[in-house]
A protein has these predicted regions:
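Alpha-solenoid helical repeat scaffolds
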Residues: 25, 29, 54, 58-61, ...
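Short helix-capping/linker turns of helical repeat alpha-solenoids
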Residues: 2-3, 16, 29-33, 45-47, ...
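Hydrophobic face of amphipathic alpha-helices that form TPR/SEL1-like repeat modules
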Residues: 2-9, 38-45, 76-79
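Structural signature of tandem alpha-helical TPR/SEL1-like repeats
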Residues: 12-22, 50-58, 85, 89
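Intrinsic-disorder/low-complexity detector
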Residues: 20, 24, 65, 73-74, ...
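Alpha-helical protein-protein interaction scaffolds
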Residues: 40, 56-65, 71-78
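Terminal, low-structured helical/coil segments at or just beyond the last alpha-helical repeat
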Residues: 2-5, 15, 27, 77-108
Length: 108
């Protein structure tokens, strides 16, 4: 099956399923960097969610902050379509996502 990141990303892209996107987001909010990468990818593609490059950049930043090197290239491609203000907004969103993840980790 390959690694879980590839599986999640492929599943999300092939299915174009809002329910699957919500499930991946639940894992991403719990700090799963593979789910964060996959969510960044589906927001970049608009699969199962509305296309949102700011949200994509934010989730990819969260994955990078956890050491996901694969997210760096995708995030740099997303950055090309964003203004500096949008990148700043995405980085603020990523910080909020990471705080949510920290609070979840402290509860479990």
């Amino acid at each position: 099956m390959g690694n879980s990141k590839e599986y999640l990303a492929e599943l999300a892209l092939y299915r174009n399923d809002p329910e699957l996107a919500r499930t991946i987001e639940e894992y991403a909010l719990q700090g799963d960097k593979n789910a964060q990468y996959a969510l960044g990818l589906i927001y970049a593609e608009g699969r199962g969610v509305q296309y949102n490059p700011v949200e994509s950049y934010a989730w990819l930043t969260a994955a990078i902050m956890q050491g996901d090197q694969d997210a760096i290239l995708l995030r740099s491609m997303i950055a090309e379509v964003l203004s500096s203000e949008a990148i700043e907004e995405a980085e603020e969103r990523a910080a909020i996502l990471m705080m949510h993840e920290d609070s979840f980790a402290n509860q479990h």
